[in-house]
Amino acid sequence: MLTDSLFSYATTRHAARSPVPHSTEIAPPESPPRPGHVPPRPERRAWVVLVMIVVFMMISYADKAVLGLAAVPLMEELGIGKSTYGLISSSFYLLFSLSGLVVGFFSARISSRVLLLAMAALWAVAQLPVLLVAAVPSLIAGRVLLGMAEGPAASMSMHALYKWFPTGRRGLPSALQIGGAALGTAVSAPLLTWLIVDHGWRSAFVALTLVSAAWCLVWPFVGQDGPFGEERKPVRGASRPPRAAGPPLRALLTNGTVTGGILSAFGSHWALALSSAWLPVYLQTQMDMTATGASSVVSGVSVVSLALLLSVPAYVDRLKRRGVSSRRADGIPQGLAVLVAGGALALLPFAAGGPVQLLLIAVAFGCHAVALPLHYVTTATVVPDGRRGAVFGVVAASGTLPGLFVPYLTGRLVDGAATETAGYTAAFVLSAGVMAVCGLLAIATIHPERDARRLNPAGASVPAPRQAGVSKPVAQ
């Protein structure tokens, strides 16, 4: 999903928070930048907040990764099979989507600063049950609580981040926020594996508890809501400016751009759920790697994701500032990333030779990450600021649904097959098919400029990009 804020933003006061309007009158979405228009540069404070949010996401994904890294010794100590382990892993997502949805609808009433602090505090508490009693029920209880607390993390931290960065400057910050996930896995995998191998798997859970608590101590001093996308209190005696009539929430959620973004996120999170729960186990049991070797591969995959997250969205921002449409810059790449990752995953079970397998693993579990920041960017293009938190909550809740069943389904397929190898083959081919369908549908349905004009015909105009040497807007 590097984060927080020590900034001295001299000219910006703390933005007033307002509840979701009871009427249908809401501020229109921010228009995509006009060709040749350069959005205002974010103030220095925004970058401090960004750093804290990246760290927030690093901790979040380390919490997710620790169970997979500890899976082999944990299954051996507790004497559980792969189906039971898959159930424990899936339990993380039992309340994950629901909590993301609920918190999203309250995000306009509660400061992002408070929401993020509450989440991180619960992360620390959620690691305690397994430390007190190492058993399947305590593992499930801790993972359910952790999933509930982490469900809103990506969408709400992105919502908080967008309060600091204007339209046209959000691609790189979005990528860094999501990059915190890849960076968290890349950094935490070798460190947590070292703790697991040398000090037992419980030590990794203790370390994550302490890190979450430390973040909670720093955030209240530096966390703050930003100036963009929040309603300001009018000056006393001044008339409130007219506001555009906004579309109903149902129309926002069912337009092609938001639906396509959900599909690309669904395919990406399918791969993410599969890799978080099963990639370390697959590397150790099917490719005969040590725990340390497996953690190195997991870190390498995260580095691939991070490199793409840092390069692709930044390039996308530059394209849009040059007049390239959001569909071409944001929409097609996110669907294509999921499609390519699915293709690599389909080939993985049939590849011969370690280097080829490692390359396919890097593509299958690394490339899909590009879809995660870009689907938020395309969604924000068509959604009014006053409803962005709620829509982000729905998008996150829908897109992350694979985590609820993919780990358990994979465990059942592996346990139920004639051999473990056959089980993994079935799981990977099935996953590849789902990812391919999601990627293709995302490419076909995401049209940000078109949908923004349809949803806000009376609002601010959404200019179409112009091709070089052409004076007329290009039809979307």
Residue ranges and their predicted role:
Residues A126, P137-L145, P355-V363:
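Paired small-residue
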Residues L67-G68, G256-V312, L372, Y376, ...:
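Extracytoplasmic gate region of multi-pass secondary transporters
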Residues A65, Y93-L101, G151, T185-A186, ...:
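Residue-level signature of mid-helix packing/kink "hotspots" within the transmembrane helices
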Residues L176-P227:
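Helix-loop-helix hairpin linking two adjacent transmembrane segments in secondary transporters
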Residues P35-P42, G226-I262, P463-P465:
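Juxtamembrane intracellular "pre-TM" segments in multi-pass secondary transporters
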Residues L98-A134:
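Conserved MFS/SLC helix-loop-helix module at the cytosolic interface between two early adjacent transmembrane helices
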Residues G79, S111, L132-S138, P166, ...:
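Helix-breaking motifs and short loop linkers at transmembrane-helix boundaries and internal kinks
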Residues G142-A181:
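Cytoplasmic helix-loop-helix junction between adjacent transmembrane helices
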